[in-house]
Amino acid sequence: MDSHHGYPFMTPEERELNLLYDEAINVTGGFDVPKFPDEFVMEGQIVPVVFAHSEYMREIGSRYCKLAIETYNKQHNTNFQFTELIKWNAAALLNYITFKAIDQNSFGRPMKTFQAEIYDHPGKDELDQVEVEFCRLAPPDL
């Protein structure tokens, strides 16, 4: 029996999308992945978080970005300030966020794009539940 990469229940189109998804995960680390059809969900799948029309979700995303850039600033002795949430993908409690920030010490310099991986621990009190796994400058092609 041909397992079709472990998913015999997928249609040929879904298998093709799954291969593209796997490749995107390998290339981007979860920061840029194709969207599966809504009726098809895999355990652990990284999916886009819809934040554009939700003030609550924008606030959470902004909080994640501010914590991430604070971590970056401490690690690199810089003074970036979060300005804009660009993209947010998530798989359960793990968040892959792309955002822009500006260097407060460099007048007139363009904003830079960052990527952060954020883990939101369940059950901890509000101040301690979010952990910045890493924050880095995004690859130049973004």
Give residue ranges: language-model regions.
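Compact beta-sheet-dominated globular domain cores
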Residues: 1-56, 86-142
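Short, non-transmembrane alpha-helical segments in secretory-pathway proteins
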Residues: 50-80
